[in-house]
Amino acid sequence: MSRTYEVAVKYILDIPRFTKKNDLVHTKTFLRYLGDPQEDLKILHVAGTNGKGSVCAYLDAMLRAEGKHTGLFTSPHLVRMNERIVLDGRQIGDESFCQVFEEVLSKVREMQEAGMPHPTFFEFLFGMAMLAFQKAGVEYAVVETGLGGRLDATNAAEHPLVTVITSIGMDHMEYLGDTIGKIAGEKAGIIRPGVPVFYAQTCEESDRVIRQTTENRHCFCKKIGKDAYEILGIEDKHIAFSCANAYYGNTTWKLNNIGVYQPGNALLAMESMRFLFGETGHPKLWRQALAEVKWGGRMEEILPDVYVDGAHNISAVEAFAQSVPESAEGNIILFSAVRDKEYTEMIACLCRNVQADLYVVAQIGDDRGAGASALGKVFEEHTDKPVIVRESVKDAFRYVLEHQKGRAVYCLGSLYLTGEIKGLIQEVKQKC
């Protein structure tokens, strides 16, 4: 990693220290200073509470299978910032990252000289992604919202080809509202007049909000319900499913994942592709592409029988629990969370629904991390199984590996936890 790259990353990480939230007028002005690179892209805009990253990865893979040049913008990153900007399936290189950073920073300086505020952390990276995509000749850009949708910086891209809304749950309530309906309203804020909408069935309240928004904005709208596909089984750590749809034929689809929630995410992406390409599309190529997708931090096997899952809200933990297979040997849970999440409910759900005979807790390295002892006490209130408290993720991860003994290990509760664990493994690999 070059010194220049380190300096660029440090600058971006320091942005929250001297900026505040800007409105969409500011984001549009920022993009205008960059030459409005988003206007040269065919954008697929994705919002939702859970599953956004997976849907984006599936869309990107199928677009590439169609021979399209793609850009993928997602957040957060788990280990390196480059993960957020992907060109034709490859993370942007350090050199290209630095080149785009310098171009964006130069325009930011011009904005500041004109009396305008500095872009936020997320705005800056969004601008970098749009410029990187334009410079690379990207045709289709898959863009994931950062938080919510209505006021999200990505909503400054005003002309998407299609809008996708994944499952909606209770998360970020301090910003998005304290009911499913309010949160759905924020997510539905990315819906543009006349732009087709595909959304995942969640509950009647969120469905009603999305349907009403599409009616008001005269959009084609399609709901992807759980009755639209059938899970056929899990074999060799792949999940197989079929679709109740003649377009796909009598075909079995496979995903390189054991999460029972992933077929719904895949079908949401598939139906969006079907709308875009119709009879000119190649579902057989999509099938091959989907089977090869590995999306980090979602039931991702990082070592033999060791999985990380970014579930960090109650609905995601419920979906995770449904995906854990029964095991005669038992399972080990490694858990951590940030203080402002409803971790008590998450822990109660785990203890109630997952067969585990050992729980290990730790405090993540981020300042927002919940204390390990506090997490341990909550587990002890909900289980009579052993609860081991370790102050650092590194010590906790070492402990579960030493005590695995043929059992599956599942690490969840925070994307910060997922990133720390993946970072530890990368460090070991680099030393070998």
Where are these predicted regions, by residue range?
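Beta-strand->loop->alpha-helix junctions that form or flank phosphate-binding loops
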Residues: 73, 200-201, 213-235, 255-260, ...
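Hydrophobic alpha-helical packing residues
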Residues: 59-64, 133, 379, 425
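Short functional linear segments
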Residues: 1-48, 55-68, 73, 109-116
